Each structure stands twice: as C-alpha cells, then as structure tokens.
Amino acid sequence: MKLPIYLDYSATCPVDPRVAEKMVQYMTMDGTFGNPASRSHRYGWQAEEAVDTAREQIAELLNADPREIVFTSGATESDNLAIKGAAHFYSKQGKHVITSKTEHKAVLDTCRQLEREGFEVTYLEPESNGLISLSKLEAAMRDDTVLVSIMHVNNEIGVIQDIEAIGELCRSRKIIFHVDAAQSAGKVAIDVQKLKVDLISLSAHKIYGPKGIGALYVRRKPRIRLEAQMHGGGHERGFRSGTLPTHQIVGMGEAFRIAKLDMEKDYQHALALRNRLLDGVKDMEAVTINGDLDQRVPHNLNISFAFVEGESLLMSLKDLAVSSGSACTSASLEPSYVLRALGLNDELAHSSIRFSFGRFTTEEEIDYAIEQIRVAVEKLRDMSPLWDMYKDGIDLNTVEWAHH
C-alpha cells in the first residue's frame, strides 16, 4: 500500500497504463508525430487518421456523431466556448442566461463575464440535497432566455441532476441547453439520442486520460451555432483553431473507449468502496453526508465532521490525499460555495472533506482511511471546547460569543 493514499479522484485521475502506452506511440520520430492538418504527406494523413479514430471513440460514449465532437484544451475551455459561443451567437434573440449556484467556477465565471457584457444571468438555488427543482427552473425562464447551463454531476458533492427532464423543458421552450459533464462522462450513461442536450463539456483527466485535453459536443440536429473564441487556422470546423495535439487526443480516445467498456465494472467497484467507507464512519457522532445519497455517483462522498476545522482535519489526515471543497477553489480559505448553497452554515461547510475514489482504489486503502479518520476526528474533538459544550447539551446557537 502506497502512502499517502490517493482519495481525490474528483480532482484528477492517474492516467490508465493502457492510455499512457498508446500516447507514447504518437510523439517521437519512430511514432506517428505528424500534424493532422498536413494534407500533403503520409505523416499528416496518419496523424489525422489517429485523431478521427479518437473522435469516434469519444462520440461512441455519448452515442453521438463524430462530427459533433470538437477538441479543446479541457472542460474549462469547453464551458467557455459553449456559454460565450452560444450567448454571443444568439444574442439577437435574447440576453438572458440561467445557471445554478453550485456550478463549477468555469461556468460561473464565464457567466459573470457575460454579465459584464450586458447579459442578465439568473443563478438558481439548489434544494438542500443539491438538486435543482424543475419548477424553479421553469419559473426562471423568460422569452429572452437563450441558454441554460446545468452540470450533470457536481464535482464537490457528486449529485446527479435530472438532465433528461431539464432537456425536455429547454427544448419545449426553444432554449439552448449546455451540460458540463466533466464529472459524469464514463461514470453515468449519456445518450444524446435520448437526451435533449445541445452542448456537452468533456474532460479527459477525470476519466483516466491525460490533462490538457477535452472536448465539446455540439449538436447537429437541430443544429447549434457558436461564435468561435479561439481564432486562427480554422481547425475543428472553425469552432476552435490550433494544431491538434495528436498524442493527447489519442489518449482521450483510448480513455473513453476503456470507460465505455468498463463503465459497469468501475461503477460497482466505486459503489462497494463508497459503502465500505460510509459504513466505517456513519456511527460516529455529529457526522453529516452532504448531497443526496441516492441520486449521486458512488465515486464521491462529501462528509462534514461537526466541531472539527476542515483545514486541521486535512493536516491530521496526512496519509490520505483528500480535499476540502474542489481543487479549483481550495486555494482560497473561503468555505465551499457549493455547500453554502445547500444551506450549510460556515462552520459545517468548513468542516467538510471530500473523499473520491476510482479504478485503482483498493478495499485495504479504504479500511486504512477509516481508521485514520476516526483517530484524527477524535483527537481534534478532544481539543475543542465547542465539542465539550455540545456534549454537555448546550445549544451552540444560543451562546452569546464575546467579540474581541
């Protein structure tokens, strides 16, 4: 067992050895290193063929047409291209966008940018279980609403939004629907023939592919138009210029191929580990699971340990690689905005830890983690005067704290 134990799969995954092996064949002189846009010689043709194969592998996971896949540098760029691209192209029809308060920063900050450009954005509050209410969404829709952006699976709490129902609603109102599927692709089945979703952001490194590569699914029927955000040689049918990184694209394709093949196996494996971890900590006092437990991917468990400071718990769990909040926001010491949106108070939001596991996590590692968590929480609570007061039956909300 290698320490520290990696339990932060929602931040990134190790590259699957099968993926790494494939990628190496597309870089050096004895490999296929050509530019896929070089049309005049075999080096280019072979690289283009490799890209086409990967495009098909990615499309297959979504049951899409390969021509609907546009390569980007990752889900952040895909979110930017989808939201800015659609909002700008359709701005004559209206300048109102709807999203939720628990979206990834790549969606929220892109929407903030649109607001600076004169768009109006409605940020929906989720229910306390993290799910978006359809009636609230419908109530927010207006005649000038051009875009709705709701993520499939939340990166902090793992809840699965009902994008099928949301898609039906958007289509009936002729509103473009964008879904950030960085955390769901390869974990939950996505079928674009069934789902009325127009734009889907995808990432490779969340499903055992390389970092720095992603894609945007852009529906052809009914056709969705976007304004390009990256200008240049007109690559990717003009949606996204820039030389295609063949080795990364091949890696993403292989990762998606394996994900489709192993989806059920990976799912059951994660579920067994999640239940094992949950069973190991649920008898502890003052422990809360954040987010709906049923409508959720099994790869994620977000737990609040009351009366323990999240940062000090992270430090005490030095042999576990876990996070409080998401990797993208843990650089700031603010409590998680996702947990705040669920209605958790600052203290509880600050005392939460996200455990996320995956293909290479073992039962032995989970058992070790349980032991570490129990010891660390007990030790920190022993040092906490608040814990003593709680144990004495004092309602901490009624205490008048002296201000220094």
UniProtKB/Swiss-Prot annotation:
It comes from the Bacteria. One of its GO terms (molecular function) is cysteine desulfurase activity. GO terms for biological process: [2Fe-2S] cluster assembly. The keyword Metal-binding applies. It catalyses: (sulfur carrier)-H + L-cysteine = (sulfur carrier)-SH + L-alanine. [2Fe-2S] cluster binds at residue 328. InterPro entries: Aminotrans_V_dom, Aminotrans_V_PyrdxlP_BS, Cys_deSase_IscS, Cysteine_dSase, PyrdxlP-dep_Trfase, PyrdxlP-dep_Trfase_major, PyrdxlP-dep_Trfase_small. Its EC number is 2.8.1.7. The modification N6-(pyridoxal phosphate)lysine is found at residue 206. Pathway: Cofactor biosynthesis; iron-sulfur cluster biosynthesis. The active site is at 328 (cysteine persulfide intermediate). SUPFAM superfamilies: PLP-dependent transferases. GO terms for cellular component: L-cysteine desulfurase complex. It is found in: Cytoplasm. Keywords: 2Fe-2S, Cytoplasm, Iron, Iron-sulfur, Metal-binding, Pyridoxal phosphate, Transferase. Pfam families: Aminotran_5. Pyridoxal 5'-phosphate binds at residues 75-76, 155, 183, 203-205, 243. Its cofactor is pyridoxal 5'-phosphate. Homodimer. Forms a heterotetramer with IscU, interacts with other sulfur acceptors. Belongs to the class-V pyridoxal-phosphate-dependent aminotransferase family. NifS/IscS subfamily. Master enzyme that delivers sulfur to a number of partners involved in Fe-S cluster assembly, tRNA modification or cofactor biosynthesis. Catalyzes the removal of elemental sulfur atoms from cysteine to produce alanine. Functions as a sulfur delivery protein for Fe-S cluster synthesis onto IscU, an Fe-S scaffold assembly protein, as well as other S acceptor proteins. This is Cysteine desulfurase IscS. It comes from Vibrio vulnificus (strain CMCP6).
